[in-house]
Protein backbone atom coordinates (compact mmCIF):
# COMPACT_ATOMS: atom_id res chain seq x y z
CA UNK A 1 0.00 0.00 0.00
CA UNK A 2 2.83 2.38 0.92
CA UNK A 3 4.50 1.61 -2.38
CA UNK A 4 1.36 2.53 -4.32
CA UNK A 5 1.04 5.79 -2.39
CA UNK A 6 4.68 6.62 -3.12
CA UNK A 7 4.24 5.95 -6.83
CA UNK A 8 1.14 8.14 -6.92
CA UNK A 9 2.97 10.95 -5.14
CA UNK A 10 5.79 10.78 -7.69
CA UNK A 11 3.59 10.49 -10.77
CA UNK A 12 0.94 13.05 -9.83
CA UNK A 13 3.27 16.09 -9.92
CA UNK A 14 4.57 14.96 -13.30
CA UNK A 15 1.02 14.67 -14.63
CA UNK A 16 0.09 18.08 -13.27
CA UNK A 17 3.22 19.59 -14.80
CA UNK A 18 2.50 17.91 -18.11
CA UNK A 19 -1.01 19.44 -18.15
CA UNK A 20 0.26 23.01 -17.76
CA UNK A 21 3.17 24.84 -19.39
CA UNK A 22 4.53 28.36 -19.07
CA UNK A 23 6.32 30.41 -21.69
CA UNK A 24 9.54 30.66 -19.67
CA UNK A 25 9.58 26.90 -19.05
CA UNK A 26 9.23 26.27 -22.78
CA UNK A 27 12.10 28.66 -23.55
CA UNK A 28 14.37 27.02 -21.00
CA UNK A 29 13.62 23.51 -22.24
CA UNK A 30 14.06 24.60 -25.87
CA UNK A 31 17.51 26.06 -25.11
CA UNK A 32 18.54 23.01 -23.09
CA UNK A 33 17.53 20.57 -25.84
CA UNK A 34 18.58 22.57 -28.90
CA UNK A 35 21.28 20.58 -30.78
CA UNK A 36 23.55 23.61 -31.12
CA UNK A 37 23.92 23.94 -27.33
CA UNK A 38 26.55 21.18 -27.37
CA UNK A 39 28.80 23.53 -29.35
CA UNK A 40 29.43 25.59 -26.20
CA UNK A 41 31.41 22.73 -24.69
CA UNK A 42 33.24 22.06 -27.97
CA UNK A 43 34.27 25.71 -28.22
CA UNK A 44 35.61 25.66 -24.67
CA UNK A 45 37.55 22.44 -25.29
CA UNK A 46 39.12 23.86 -28.46
CA UNK A 47 40.09 27.04 -26.62
CA UNK A 48 41.65 25.10 -23.72
CA UNK A 49 43.65 22.88 -26.08
CA UNK A 50 44.96 25.91 -27.97
CA UNK A 51 45.94 27.73 -24.76
CA UNK A 52 47.68 24.64 -23.43
CA UNK A 53 49.64 24.19 -26.65
CA UNK A 54 50.68 27.85 -26.64
CA UNK A 55 51.89 27.61 -23.03
CA UNK A 56 54.06 24.62 -23.93
CA UNK A 57 56.16 26.86 -26.15
CA UNK A 58 57.95 27.91 -22.94
CA UNK A 59 59.06 24.34 -22.30
CA UNK A 60 62.56 23.30 -23.42
CA UNK A 61 62.54 22.18 -27.04
CA UNK A 62 64.68 19.07 -27.53
CA UNK A 63 65.87 17.88 -30.93
CA UNK A 64 68.16 15.02 -31.97
CA UNK A 65 69.86 14.43 -35.31
CA UNK A 66 72.29 11.99 -36.93
CA UNK A 67 74.37 12.88 -39.99
CA UNK A 68 77.09 11.58 -42.25
CA UNK A 69 79.35 14.13 -43.93
CA UNK A 70 81.99 13.96 -46.67
CA UNK A 71 84.21 16.99 -47.18
CA UNK A 72 87.48 18.22 -48.59
CA UNK A 73 90.67 18.46 -46.55
CA UNK A 74 90.16 20.50 -43.39
CA UNK A 75 93.84 20.78 -42.49
CA UNK A 76 96.92 21.33 -44.54
CA UNK A 77 98.93 18.33 -43.32
CA UNK A 78 102.55 18.51 -44.45
CA UNK A 79 105.04 15.66 -44.63
CA UNK A 80 106.49 16.47 -41.25
CA UNK A 81 103.08 16.13 -39.59
CA UNK A 82 102.47 12.88 -41.41
CA UNK A 83 105.78 11.51 -40.11
CA UNK A 84 104.52 12.38 -36.64
CA UNK A 85 101.39 10.27 -37.30
CA UNK A 86 98.93 13.11 -37.82
CA UNK A 87 96.37 12.25 -40.48
CA UNK A 88 92.94 13.67 -41.45
CA UNK A 89 89.85 11.97 -42.80
CA UNK A 90 87.42 13.29 -45.37
CA UNK A 91 84.32 11.67 -43.84
CA UNK A 92 82.60 12.03 -40.51
CA UNK A 93 79.53 10.49 -38.86
CA UNK A 94 77.97 12.41 -36.00
CA UNK A 95 74.98 12.48 -33.67
CA UNK A 96 73.71 15.62 -31.92
CA UNK A 97 71.21 16.44 -29.17
CA UNK A 98 70.22 20.09 -28.86
CA UNK A 99 68.05 21.84 -26.26
CA UNK A 100 66.55 25.30 -26.91
CA UNK A 101 64.80 27.38 -24.24
CA UNK A 102 62.85 30.55 -24.93
CA UNK A 103 64.04 33.41 -22.75
CA UNK A 104 62.27 36.31 -24.46
CA UNK A 105 59.93 36.00 -27.45
CA UNK A 106 58.77 39.59 -27.82
CA UNK A 107 55.31 38.71 -26.49
CA UNK A 108 54.37 36.35 -29.33
CA UNK A 109 53.19 33.49 -27.09
CA UNK A 110 51.10 35.86 -24.98
CA UNK A 111 49.57 37.29 -28.16
CA UNK A 112 48.72 33.80 -29.41
CA UNK A 113 46.94 33.04 -26.14
CA UNK A 114 44.98 36.27 -26.36
CA UNK A 115 43.90 35.44 -29.90
CA UNK A 116 42.78 31.97 -28.82
CA UNK A 117 40.61 33.46 -26.07
CA UNK A 118 39.22 36.13 -28.39
CA UNK A 119 38.35 33.60 -31.10
CA UNK A 120 36.55 31.41 -28.57
CA UNK A 121 34.62 34.45 -27.33
CA UNK A 122 33.56 35.33 -30.88
CA UNK A 123 32.31 31.78 -31.42
CA UNK A 124 30.49 31.87 -28.07
CA UNK A 125 28.72 35.12 -28.92
CA UNK A 126 27.88 33.93 -32.43
CA UNK A 127 26.27 30.84 -30.95
CA UNK A 128 24.43 33.01 -28.41
CA UNK A 129 22.89 34.97 -31.30
CA UNK A 130 21.53 31.80 -32.92
CA UNK A 131 20.27 30.57 -29.53
CA UNK A 132 18.54 33.92 -28.95
CA UNK A 133 16.60 33.58 -32.21
CA UNK A 134 15.26 30.34 -30.81
CA UNK A 135 13.32 32.25 -28.13
CA UNK A 136 11.33 34.17 -30.72
CA UNK A 137 10.39 30.99 -32.57
CA UNK A 138 9.17 29.41 -29.33
CA UNK A 139 7.17 32.56 -28.53
CA UNK A 140 5.44 32.47 -31.91
CA UNK A 141 4.39 28.85 -31.46
CA UNK A 142 3.32 29.42 -27.85
CA UNK A 143 1.13 32.43 -28.64
CA UNK A 144 -0.17 30.63 -31.71
CA UNK A 145 -1.55 27.90 -29.43
CA UNK A 146 -3.03 30.51 -27.07
CA UNK A 147 -4.71 32.25 -29.98
CA UNK A 148 -6.22 28.97 -31.16
CA UNK A 149 -7.36 28.23 -27.60
CA UNK A 150 -9.26 31.52 -27.57
CA UNK A 151 -10.78 30.79 -30.98
CA UNK A 152 -11.85 27.31 -29.87
CA UNK A 153 -13.42 28.75 -26.73
CA UNK A 154 -15.50 31.26 -28.68
CA UNK A 155 -16.51 28.67 -31.25
CA UNK A 156 -17.79 26.51 -28.40
CA UNK A 157 -19.71 29.51 -27.02
CA UNK A 158 -21.17 30.00 -30.49
CA UNK A 159 -22.30 26.39 -30.49
CA UNK A 160 -24.02 26.92 -27.14
CA UNK A 161 -25.80 30.02 -28.45
CA UNK A 162 -26.88 28.15 -31.58
CA UNK A 163 -28.11 25.23 -29.49
CA UNK A 164 -30.30 27.55 -27.42
CA UNK A 165 -31.54 29.25 -30.57
CA UNK A 166 -32.44 25.90 -32.11
CA UNK A 167 -34.49 24.96 -29.06
CA UNK A 168 -36.25 28.32 -29.29
CA UNK A 169 -36.99 27.90 -33.01
CA UNK A 170 -38.20 24.31 -32.52
CA UNK A 171 -40.59 25.54 -29.80
CA UNK A 172 -41.79 28.26 -32.14
CA UNK A 173 -42.31 25.64 -34.86
CA UNK A 174 -44.58 23.69 -32.55
CA UNK A 175 -46.53 26.89 -31.93
CA UNK A 176 -46.87 27.51 -35.64
CA UNK A 177 -44.75 30.67 -35.63
CA UNK A 178 -41.70 29.10 -37.37
CA UNK A 179 -41.35 26.46 -40.05
CA UNK A 180 -38.89 23.66 -40.83
CA UNK A 181 -36.69 25.88 -43.00
CA UNK A 182 -36.01 28.07 -39.96
CA UNK A 183 -34.92 25.01 -37.99
CA UNK A 184 -32.72 23.92 -40.89
CA UNK A 185 -31.10 27.35 -41.06
CA UNK A 186 -30.01 27.04 -37.43
CA UNK A 187 -28.82 23.46 -38.05
CA UNK A 188 -26.64 24.64 -40.94
CA UNK A 189 -24.97 27.23 -38.70
CA UNK A 190 -24.37 24.51 -36.11
CA UNK A 191 -22.65 22.34 -38.71
CA UNK A 192 -20.55 25.29 -39.85
CA UNK A 193 -19.49 25.87 -36.24
CA UNK A 194 -18.55 22.20 -35.84
CA UNK A 195 -16.54 22.32 -39.05
CA UNK A 196 -14.72 25.45 -37.84
CA UNK A 197 -14.03 23.80 -34.47
CA UNK A 198 -12.49 20.75 -36.16
CA UNK A 199 -10.16 22.98 -38.20
CA UNK A 200 -9.13 24.97 -35.13
CA UNK A 201 -8.42 21.85 -33.09
CA UNK A 202 -6.37 20.36 -35.94
CA UNK A 203 -4.30 23.56 -36.16
CA UNK A 204 -3.79 23.52 -32.39
CA UNK A 205 -2.53 19.92 -32.54
CA UNK A 206 -0.07 20.87 -35.29
CA UNK A 207 1.25 23.82 -33.27
CA UNK A 208 1.64 21.62 -30.19
CA UNK A 209 3.60 19.05 -32.16
CA UNK A 210 6.00 21.72 -33.42
CA UNK A 211 6.34 23.20 -29.92
CA UNK A 212 6.97 19.70 -28.56
CA UNK A 213 9.85 19.25 -31.00
CA UNK A 214 11.49 22.41 -29.68
CA UNK A 215 11.15 21.49 -26.00
CA UNK A 216 11.88 17.80 -26.64
CA UNK A 217 8.61 16.63 -25.12
CA UNK A 218 5.51 14.97 -26.54
CA UNK A 219 2.54 17.31 -25.93
CA UNK A 220 -0.96 15.87 -25.93
CA UNK A 221 -4.05 17.84 -26.90
CA UNK A 222 -4.96 18.07 -23.20
CA UNK A 223 -1.98 20.25 -22.35
CA UNK A 224 -2.85 23.76 -21.21
CA UNK A 225 -0.60 26.75 -21.85
CA UNK A 226 -0.71 29.46 -19.23
CA UNK A 227 -1.32 33.00 -20.40
CA UNK A 228 1.81 35.10 -19.76
CA UNK A 229 1.43 38.21 -17.65
CA UNK A 230 1.28 41.43 -19.65
CA UNK A 231 4.45 43.39 -18.98
CA UNK A 232 5.57 46.95 -19.51
CA UNK A 233 9.19 47.84 -20.22
CA UNK A 234 10.61 50.85 -18.42
CA UNK A 235 13.45 51.46 -20.86
CA UNK A 236 14.13 50.86 -24.53
CA UNK A 237 17.90 50.34 -24.22
CA UNK A 238 19.08 47.43 -26.37
CA UNK A 239 20.93 44.51 -24.77
CA UNK A 240 20.87 42.08 -27.68
CA UNK A 241 23.59 39.38 -27.92
CA UNK A 242 24.50 40.74 -31.35
CA UNK A 243 26.12 43.72 -29.63
CA UNK A 244 28.27 41.40 -27.53
CA UNK A 245 29.21 39.57 -30.72
CA UNK A 246 30.39 42.79 -32.38
CA UNK A 247 32.35 43.69 -29.24
CA UNK A 248 34.00 40.25 -29.30
CA UNK A 249 34.97 40.79 -32.96
CA UNK A 250 36.64 44.07 -32.05
CA UNK A 251 38.52 42.39 -29.20
CA UNK A 252 39.76 39.76 -31.65
CA UNK A 253 41.02 42.46 -34.02
CA UNK A 254 42.83 44.15 -31.15
CA UNK A 255 44.49 40.85 -30.21
CA UNK A 256 45.60 40.40 -33.81
CA UNK A 257 47.06 43.91 -33.79
CA UNK A 258 49.10 43.07 -30.68
CA UNK A 259 50.35 39.94 -32.38
CA UNK A 260 51.59 42.06 -35.29
CA UNK A 261 53.43 44.29 -32.82
CA UNK A 262 55.07 41.28 -31.15
CA UNK A 263 56.66 40.28 -34.45
CA UNK A 264 58.72 43.48 -34.45
CA UNK A 265 60.73 42.52 -31.36
CA UNK A 266 63.84 40.31 -31.32
CA UNK A 267 63.82 36.91 -29.64
CA UNK A 268 66.35 35.55 -27.19
CA UNK A 269 66.95 31.84 -26.66
CA UNK A 270 69.34 29.81 -24.55
CA UNK A 271 70.68 26.63 -26.04
CA UNK A 272 72.76 23.64 -25.08
CA UNK A 273 74.00 20.80 -27.26
CA UNK A 274 76.00 17.64 -27.13
CA UNK A 275 77.76 16.17 -30.18
CA UNK A 276 79.39 12.79 -30.65
CA UNK A 277 81.22 12.11 -33.91
CA UNK A 278 83.92 10.03 -35.49
CA UNK A 279 87.37 11.56 -35.44
CA UNK A 280 88.50 13.50 -38.44
CA UNK A 281 91.96 13.66 -36.96
CA UNK A 282 93.67 12.38 -33.86
CA UNK A 283 93.90 15.94 -32.60
CA UNK A 284 90.10 15.99 -32.07
CA UNK A 285 87.98 14.34 -29.39
CA UNK A 286 84.94 12.21 -30.18
CA UNK A 287 82.49 14.40 -28.25
CA UNK A 288 81.73 18.01 -27.49
CA UNK A 289 79.37 19.99 -25.24
CA UNK A 290 78.35 23.56 -26.00
CA UNK A 291 75.95 26.16 -24.63
CA UNK A 292 75.10 29.79 -25.12
CA UNK A 293 72.54 32.43 -26.08
CA UNK A 294 71.01 33.22 -29.45
CA UNK A 295 69.61 36.66 -30.25
CA UNK A 296 67.67 36.85 -33.50
CA UNK A 297 65.61 39.57 -35.11
CA UNK A 298 63.51 38.87 -38.18
CA UNK A 299 62.72 42.10 -40.00
CA UNK A 300 60.48 40.36 -42.53
CA UNK A 301 57.39 41.51 -40.57
CA UNK A 302 58.22 45.10 -41.53
CA UNK A 303 57.62 44.37 -45.20
CA UNK A 304 53.93 43.50 -44.73
CA UNK A 305 53.14 45.48 -41.57
CA UNK A 306 51.56 48.43 -43.34
CA UNK A 307 49.15 46.27 -45.33
CA UNK A 308 48.44 44.07 -42.31
CA UNK A 309 47.41 47.13 -40.29
CA UNK A 310 45.27 48.42 -43.14
CA UNK A 311 43.55 45.06 -43.36
CA UNK A 312 42.72 45.15 -39.65
CA UNK A 313 41.34 48.68 -40.01
CA UNK A 314 39.10 47.57 -42.89
CA UNK A 315 37.82 44.65 -40.84
CA UNK A 316 37.12 46.99 -37.92
CA UNK A 317 35.14 49.28 -40.22
CA UNK A 318 33.14 46.28 -41.40
CA UNK A 319 32.27 45.41 -37.80
CA UNK A 320 31.22 49.01 -37.14
CA UNK A 321 29.06 48.98 -40.27
CA UNK A 322 27.40 45.72 -39.25
CA UNK A 323 26.71 47.08 -35.76
CA UNK A 324 25.21 50.31 -37.12
CA UNK A 325 23.05 48.36 -39.59
CA UNK A 326 21.81 46.04 -36.85
CA UNK A 327 20.94 48.92 -34.52
CA UNK A 328 19.12 50.73 -37.34
CA UNK A 329 17.06 47.68 -38.31
CA UNK A 330 16.40 46.88 -34.67
CA UNK A 331 15.17 50.42 -34.08
CA UNK A 332 12.78 50.10 -37.01
CA UNK A 333 11.44 46.83 -35.61
CA UNK A 334 11.03 48.35 -32.14
CA UNK A 335 9.18 51.38 -33.55
CA UNK A 336 6.89 49.10 -35.56
CA UNK A 337 6.18 46.90 -32.53
CA UNK A 338 5.50 49.92 -30.32
CA UNK A 339 3.07 51.19 -32.96
CA UNK A 340 1.26 47.84 -32.95
CA UNK A 341 1.08 47.90 -29.15
CA UNK A 342 -0.48 51.38 -29.13
CA UNK A 343 -2.96 50.35 -31.85
CA UNK A 344 -3.99 47.15 -30.02
CA UNK A 345 -4.56 49.05 -26.76
CA UNK A 346 -6.93 51.43 -28.56
CA UNK A 347 -8.69 48.56 -30.31
CA UNK A 348 -9.27 46.74 -27.02
CA UNK A 349 -11.09 49.78 -25.62
CA UNK A 350 -13.39 49.78 -28.66
CA UNK A 351 -13.71 45.98 -28.62
CA UNK A 352 -15.45 46.09 -25.24
CA UNK A 353 -18.01 48.56 -26.54
CA UNK A 354 -18.51 46.60 -29.76
CA UNK A 355 -19.16 43.36 -27.83
CA UNK A 356 -21.63 45.14 -25.52
CA UNK A 357 -23.56 46.61 -28.44
CA UNK A 358 -23.55 43.33 -30.39
CA UNK A 359 -24.95 41.47 -27.39
CA UNK A 360 -27.74 44.06 -27.02
CA UNK A 361 -28.63 43.74 -30.70
CA UNK A 362 -28.66 39.94 -30.43
CA UNK A 363 -30.92 39.97 -27.36
CA UNK A 364 -33.40 42.29 -29.07
CA UNK A 365 -33.29 40.15 -32.20
CA UNK A 366 -34.12 37.01 -30.21
CA UNK A 367 -37.14 38.78 -28.68
CA UNK A 368 -38.32 39.92 -32.11
CA UNK A 369 -38.04 36.38 -33.44
CA UNK A 370 -40.21 35.12 -30.59
CA UNK A 371 -42.76 37.80 -31.44
CA UNK A 372 -42.57 36.91 -35.12
CA UNK A 373 -41.43 40.37 -36.23
CA UNK A 374 -37.95 39.28 -37.41
CA UNK A 375 -36.70 36.30 -39.39
CA UNK A 376 -34.53 33.53 -37.98
CA UNK A 377 -31.81 34.35 -40.51
CA UNK A 378 -31.54 37.88 -39.10
CA UNK A 379 -31.19 36.45 -35.61
CA UNK A 380 -28.46 34.03 -36.77
CA UNK A 381 -26.59 36.90 -38.36
CA UNK A 382 -26.59 38.78 -35.06
CA UNK A 383 -25.50 35.66 -33.15
CA UNK A 384 -22.54 35.20 -35.50
CA UNK A 385 -21.70 38.89 -35.15
CA UNK A 386 -21.51 38.54 -31.36
CA UNK A 387 -19.22 35.53 -31.72
CA UNK A 388 -16.93 37.39 -34.12
CA UNK A 389 -16.80 40.44 -31.84
CA UNK A 390 -15.87 38.31 -28.83
CA UNK A 391 -13.27 36.43 -30.83
CA UNK A 392 -11.79 39.65 -32.15
CA UNK A 393 -11.49 41.02 -28.62
CA UNK A 394 -9.72 37.88 -27.40
CA UNK A 395 -7.45 37.94 -30.45
CA UNK A 396 -6.45 41.53 -29.74
CA UNK A 397 -5.77 40.70 -26.07
CA UNK A 398 -3.43 37.85 -27.00
CA UNK A 399 -1.81 39.87 -29.78
CA UNK A 400 -1.12 42.68 -27.31
CA UNK A 401 0.63 40.34 -24.86
CA UNK A 402 2.55 38.75 -27.74
CA UNK A 403 3.62 42.19 -29.00
CA UNK A 404 4.84 43.14 -25.52
CA UNK A 405 6.93 39.98 -25.31
CA UNK A 406 8.15 40.50 -28.88
CA UNK A 407 9.31 43.99 -27.86
CA UNK A 408 11.06 42.49 -24.84
CA UNK A 409 12.79 39.98 -27.12
CA UNK A 410 13.83 42.63 -29.65
CA UNK A 411 15.73 44.62 -27.01
CA UNK A 412 16.57 41.67 -24.70
CA UNK A 413 15.19 42.93 -21.40
Protein language model regions, located:
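Bacterial Sec-dependent N-terminal signal peptides
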Residues: 1-34, 407, 411-413
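Small/polar (Gly/Ser/Thr/Ala-rich) solvent-exposed segments
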Residues: 38, 61-81, 89, 100-129, ...
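Acidic, glycine-rich loop-and-beta core segments that form the ion-binding/anion-interacting portion
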Residues: 232-277
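Periplasmic alpha-helical coiled-coil/stalk elements that build and connect Gram-negative outer-membrane
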Residues: 25, 49, 130-244, 251, ...
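Membrane-embedded beta-strands of outer-membrane beta-barrel proteins
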Residues: 97-99, 258, 293
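Start-of-domain marker
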Residues: 20-74
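Transmembrane beta-barrel architecture of outer-membrane proteins
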Residues: 92-94, 140, 185, 267, ...
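Amphipathic alpha-helical coiled-coil segments
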Residues: 39-54, 130, 134-153, 171, ...
Amino acid sequence: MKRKILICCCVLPLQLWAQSLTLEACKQRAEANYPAVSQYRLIELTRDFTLENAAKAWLPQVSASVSGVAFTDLLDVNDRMKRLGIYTKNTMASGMVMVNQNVYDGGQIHAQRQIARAQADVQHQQLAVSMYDLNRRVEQLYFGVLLLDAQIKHTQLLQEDLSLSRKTVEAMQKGGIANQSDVDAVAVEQENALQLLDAQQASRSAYLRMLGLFIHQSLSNDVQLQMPVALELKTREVYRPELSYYQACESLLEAQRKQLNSRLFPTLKAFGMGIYHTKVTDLMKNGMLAGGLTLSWNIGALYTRKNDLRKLDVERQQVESERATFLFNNRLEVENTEGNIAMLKKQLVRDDEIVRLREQIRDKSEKKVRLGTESVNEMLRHINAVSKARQQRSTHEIQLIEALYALKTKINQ
